[in-house]
Curated annotation (Swiss-Prot):
Start-end of Gly residues biased regions: 984-996
Xref: PANTHER family: 5'-3' EXORIBONUCLEASE 2 (PTHR12341:SF41), 5'->3' EXORIBONUCLEASE (PTHR12341)
E.C. number(s) listed in UniProt: 3.1.13.-
Keyword rRNA processing: yes
InterPro entries from the UniProt entry: 5_3_exoribonuclease, Xrn1_helical, Xrn1_N, Xrn2/3/4, Znf_CCHC, Znf_CCHC_sf
Biased composition (Acidic residues): 617-629, 643-660
Basic and acidic residues composition-biased segments: 411-447, 541-551, 570-588
Coiled-coil annotated spans: 121-147, 412-441
GO molecular function terms noted in the UniProt entry: 5'-3' RNA exonuclease activity; RNA binding; zinc ion binding
Originating species: Cryptococcus neoformans var. neoformans serotype D (strain JEC21 / ATCC MYA-565)
PROSITE patterns with a match to the protein in the record: ZF_CCHC
Protein name in the entry: 5'-3' exoribonuclease 2
């Protein structure tokens, strides 16, 4: 989720939630012939962490990214080798947890349109950064050649793997799907510990984000009485939103598993990426960068595997149970609904679907600010902000009003803090430079000798060691340097240049005799080239011409440097050639995602700095344009404009917000200034909004939206869209996708001061269907990544007569928007017009091959079981024996409470051979025999909408927090005892990274204190009703109910008042099966929109619908397929 530093903030504020994972490692034993062999981990042994796990869920994108482009070691050469790395990593994670019932592996499928805006931005920036790095690599090669060294053709033509391939619909994702099926079948056949597992694979052909498909499955399962209320869950992933999603399930026995990104290497402190020395970072380094031979392949460093940690959601619930209690409330406290409010307030700070409000930064304590407002206003609000995934708009207005009162103070304090921080950084940099100068002086003193008044210095002379070795075996070897007078050492390079030029004008014998002088002249040419590359804006045009001419003359006079005509014509950038030839090292300041900046995840957590690249920053921001205006005719650019990194002279004006005002400057080229990205990832630029100065609102709306503050109607549209987004996100987390095609049509958020009449906003969502995979690829890919699309679709991204060419600008603005780090800038890309995109795609569909049409279709979830599983014979007899045509409900007794329905898998033949999908890997041969079976699996219908309650039969775990821990929380982290402290990783006593306390991850003191039970609950565990009206005394608990009558529903102030229509009663009466509205208006289910590809399918996205799999509707009570099969 888009909340950088959330995990760090949580682990610092609630220290006991983090536990170190204990994992068994394979033992090395002596084999029967005396050889050393590795004994595999016995999966059936007890879990070494002291607790057993029922269900393990893997957000596979968090595994695929670090395996395909790892940090600190070379990436696998081929995609088949990447599959092997994914197998190894997945097996390590599974062996840590050892689930006993279900292993679910979910890969991101087509995302909701609201997420595509972020995906589009990240992929365009990834392509831009990849192009910058490739340009820097070529410049470094040119510099290396200018020094007289040869570069192999393989090195010169090497191309990096495009990380954008990790997107649904690409051939890579197709290979990933079949490879995981092969690996799962292999494990079920060869590992006896897997015999009772049910493995569910939801690959990229199944719509939905991986983690949300997992949570949708959990919500559906817990709506049935066969579900065990004490099921133990673990979910793996790098995104911080997994914490929020786990809390939102209201399944209390939940843990989040992730790599400990704060763990320090066992090899000691990290060296500077610039000079290779320890003790400082690259941002404070004064030395020249180390230069590496591009012909030398990078060698993997031998480091211990990174440790893993658990985040205990049950312990986090204990902390929140203390923090969220408000004394003197006029209604009973409900922990579950209070947790929902806490989650909702975090959405204000950041999420993947909306830009955060300008006044809210998590590092400035934004969550605590909102929590303080919530605690102060809760009694006056008369109830909670949220209601089982629905937002009470009137109460949301109260929170926004409280924040609005503090915005001016927040902006001023932010500026003061930034100035103090800059002053402190400047002081540290000066001190560090002084220390480096002293170290350099001491080093020079060691290499200096004074004899008879003459100062001698050491001059490198590699030939000294090649003159026959030592003078005598008893003597040391010759030194690799000569001692010369200092004055001669200074004059030596100039003499070498003159000597080389004279030699070049002579005969071949002169050239041979003066090889050293010629080589040194080559070095001078390289230095001139490097000076031009480093010159930046400080070198004027005449100087650059002079340098270029001088370099050209030297190149013509040097026989060892051969430059092609293309190299002579190639234009050089003005920044230092460093690129991928430099050792990247581990990023300083990484917070969440262990992902390089070019592919920032997600799951985009973290403060990952970007290298010394250049980004474009806008002087005039763009605004959403009239995309859907039938009179709008997009301008076209020539195909040649897509080549290179030259500034574009056209402004894209086809954004799809028909509410945006006309832009009179749309046809004028916007000047772009290149900003230098410093070594620490910061960007130097001038902030033209100045939020800390009076009049900032006028400047903000003029610069960011192109309107005046007095244009109230436009600002109201922005605030309504933003509030729609908050409602959409909350419902997405609790009930499923409200509308697949909704998105926020602006690049920036409004101020809290500008929200007015929120309670009267008419917010509702209409049902829609997800994109097909190729439609998403066209929507999020830049033209540079078109290779992953079928050839007929690639022309849509580059041909000058393409109707959607304007979706793929070759260059785009980066607005730093008051931020410091380059990765925090806003990419001002045009919003895509869905109708134009789908129309263009449809015109090319007939040109696709059968296999490409298969890749462009929605797929099925697949369940795998071993031949010893109780379900095996049932599936063989009823599915493959009779070849069932209708989905068959799963026997919940044989499945241990797991519900759903199944159909035969057309790709599975029981007891047959599974051909390997990666034949180049000898360790992965054909699987014969294959003792597993696979079936198409459909999620069950959701018996009722998800409710924020603990289910009946829940057994609490022993309390983790002591009374002193609770007192520390009540004091806001001030005074008292903080609780058991923990280690941030590494070897034993090594302390953790930023934001982590010292000590060790441990379970804390003995759990002697009993768990404080929640208030009395209804039949289904709900506590104290679902919503509250005026702050009048209410009964201590709602009427006992089994979904009939009872607690209030969506939008009604009094939970005990009779609902005026069938949908108003929320969970007490039949709830709407399609997307619901907000406020007091009754909901009328709309008709689903027509399917742009074929006949309209049933509505998708609401919980009572079928699972993510597809097929014919099953009998009543089973899962069903909301989309007809296209295969």
């Amino acid at each position: 989720m888009g909340v950088p530093a959330l995990f760090r903030w949580l682990s610092k504020k609630y220290p006991k939630i983090v536990e170190r994972v204990k994992e068994d490692t394979p033992k090395k034993i002596r084999g029967p012939d005396g050889e050393i062999v590795e004994e595999p981990i016995r999966y059936e042994n007890p879990n070494p962490n002291g607790f057993e796990v029922d269900n393990l869920y893997l957000d596979m994108n968090g595994i695929v990214h670090p395996c395909t482009h790892p940090e600190g070691r070379p990436a696998p050469e081929t995609e088949e080798e990447m599959m092997v790395e994914i197998f190894k990593y997945t097996e390590r994670v599974v062996n840590m947890c050892r689930p006993r019932k279900v292993l679910m592996m979910a890969i991101d499928g087509v995302a909701p349109r609201a997420k595509m805006n972020q995906q589009r931005s990240r992929r365009f920036r990834a392509a831009q950064e990849a192009a910058d790095k490739e340009e820097e690599r070529r410049e470094a090669i040119k510099l290396f050649e200018a020094m007289g060294h040869a570069v192999s053709e393989e090195t010169a033509n090497h191309k990096s793997w495009d990380t954008n391939a990790i997107t649904p619909g690409t051939p890579f994702m197709d290979l990933l799907s079949i490879s995981l099926k092969y690996w799962v079948s292999h494990k079920l056949t060869t590992d006896p510990g897997w015999k009772d597992l049910k493995i569910i694979l939801s690959d990229s052909s199944v719509p939905g984000e991986g983690e949300h498909k997992i949570m949708d499955w959990i919500r559906r399962q817990r709506s049935y009485p066969t579900w065990d209320a004490n099921t133990s869950h673990v979910i793996y992933g790098l995104d911080a939103d997994l914490i929020m999603l786990s809390l939102a399930t209201h399944e209390p026995h939940f843990r989040v598993l992730r790599e400990d990104v704060f763990a320090q290497s066992s090899k000691g402190p990290h060296a500077c990426k610039n000079c290779g020395k320890v003790g400082h970072i690259a941002a404070n380094c004064k030395s020249d960068k180390k230069f590496k031979d591009p012909n030398v392949a990078e060698v993997a460093k031998t480091e211990d595997p990174k440790p893993f940690i658990f985040l205990d959601v049950a312990c986090l619930r204990e902390y929140l149970a203390v923090e969220l209690v408000v004394p003197g409330m006029p209604f009973p406290f409900d922990l579950e609904l209070a947790i929902d409010d806490w989650i909702f307030m975090i959405f204000f700070v950041g999420n993947d679907f909306l830009p955060h409000l300008p006044s809210l930064e998590i590092r400035e304590g934004a969550i605590d600010v909102l929590l303080k407002i919530w605690r102060a206003e809760l009694p006056r609000m008369g109830g909670y902000l949220t209601n089982h995934g629905k937002v009470n708009l009137d109460r949301a207005q109260v929170i926004l009003e409280g924040l609005a009162k503090s915005e001016d103070e927040i902006f001023q304090k932010r500026k003061d803090d930034e100035e103090r921080q800059e002053h402190s950084q400047k002081r540290r940099r000066i001190e560090e430079h002084k220390r480096q100068d002293e170290d350099k002086a001491r080093e020079e003193d060691r290499n200096t000798l004074t004899l008879n008044g003459t100062e001698y210095v050491a001059v490198d002379n590699p030939a000294a060691t090649a003159r026959g070795g030592p003078l005598h075996p008893s003597l040391p070897s010759r030194p690799a340097f000569d001692l010369v007078p200092k004055e001669d050492a200074v004059k030596q390079p100039e003499d070498q240049d003159q000597k080389a030029k004279k030699a070049m004008a002579g005969s071949n014998s002169d050239i041979v005799k003066n090889r050293k002088a010629i080589r040194m002249a080559n070095m001078s040419a390289a230095q001139a080239l490097k000076a031009e590359l480093e010159g930046g804006n400080d070198v004027n045009v005449d100087d650059k011409k002079a340098i270029a001419q001088e370099g050209k003359e030297e190149d013509e006079a040097v026989v060892t440097v051969e430059r092609t005509e293309d190299e002579e014509k190639e234009q050089l950038t003005k920044e230092e050639a460093r690129g991928t030839l430099e050792e990247q090292g581990e990023k300083e300041g990484v917070d969440e995602e262990v992902v390089p900046p070019a592919i920032q995840t997600d799951e985009d957590e973290g403060e990952a700095p970007v290298g010394d690249a250049t980004v474009a920053e806008n002087d005039e921001s763009t605004t959403p344009e009239d995309d859907e205006d039938p009179t709008h005719v997009p301008r076209k650019r020539k195909r040649g404009d897509s080549d290179g990194d030259e500034d574009s002279n056209e402004e894209d004006d086809d954004d799809d917000d028909d509410d945006a005002p006309p832009n009179p400057e749309a046809d004028q080229p916007i000047p772009k200034k290149k900003l230098k990205v410093n070594a620490d990832g910061t960007v130097d630029y001038e902030d033209d909004v100045k939020l800390w100065e009076p009049g900032y609102r006028e400047r903000y709306y003029e610069k960011k939206f192109g309107v005046k503050l007095s244009e109230r109607e436009f600002i109201d549209k922005v605030t309504k869209s933003y509030m729609e987004g908050l409602c959409w996100v909350l419902e997405y987390y609790y009930q499923g996708v409200p509308a697949w095609d909704w998105f926020y049509p602006y690049h920036y958020a409004p101020f809290a001061q500008d929200f007015r009449d929120v309670g009267s906003m008419d917010i509702k969502f209409e049902t829609s269907i997800p994109f097909k995979p190729f439609a998403q690829l066209l929507g999020v890919f830049p033209a540079a990544s078109r290779i992953h699309l079928p050839e007929p679709l690639q022309t849509l991204m580059i041909d000058e007569d393409s109707p959607i060419l304007d979706f793929y600008p070759p260059d785009f603005e980066i607005d730093m928007n008051g931020k410091k780090m380059a990765w925090q800038g806003v990419a001002l890309l045009p919003f895509i017009d869905q109708n134009r995109l789908l129309t263009a795609l449809k015109s090319k569909e007939e040109l696709l091959s059968d296999d490409e049409k298969r890749r462009n279709s929605w797929g099925d979830n697949v369940m795998f079981i071993a031949n010893e599983n109780p379900l095996y014979d049932l599936f063989c007899d009823k599915l493959y024996g009779l070849r069932a045509k209708d989905p068959i409900p799963i026997d919940t007794k044989a499945s241990y409470g797991i519900t759903g329905s199944v159909l035969p898998d057309p790709n599975c033949v029981p007891a047959s051979t599974f051909d390997t999908p990666i034949p180049s890997i000898s360790e992965c041969p054909d699987l014969n025999p294959n003792d597993s079976i696979s079936v198409r699996y459909y999620f069950p219908r959701q018996a009722h909408p998800h409710r924020s309650i603990l289910l009946r039969g829940y057994k609490p775990e022993p309390a983790r927090l002591t009374e002193s821990d609770k007192d520390w929380v009540r004091r806001g982290g001030q005074g008292g005892r903080r609780g058991h402290r923990h280690n941030g990783g590494g070897n034993g006593n090594v302390t953790g990274g930023p934001g982590m306390a010292r000590g060790r991850y441990e379970s804390g003191p003995p759990r002697t204190n009993g768990y404080q039970p929640p208030p009395p609950r209804s039949n289904y565990g709900g506590s104290s009703g679902y919503g509250y009206g005026a702050p009048a005394p209410l009964p201590s608990r709602p009427p006992v109910s089994s979904y009939g009558g009872g607690a209030g529903g969506y939008g009604y102030s009094n939970p005990y008042a009779a609902a005026p229509n069938p949908y108003a009663g929320g969970y007490g009466a039949p709830a709407p099966y399609a997307a619901g509205g907000y406020g007091q208006r009754p909901y009328v289910p709309p008709l689903p929109p027509p399917n742009p590809y074929s006949a309209p399918p049933p509505a998708y996205g609401r919980p009572p619908g079928g699972g993510y799999g597809y097929g014919a509707p099953p009998p009543r009570g089973g899962g069903y397929n909301p989309y007809p099969s296209r295969r």
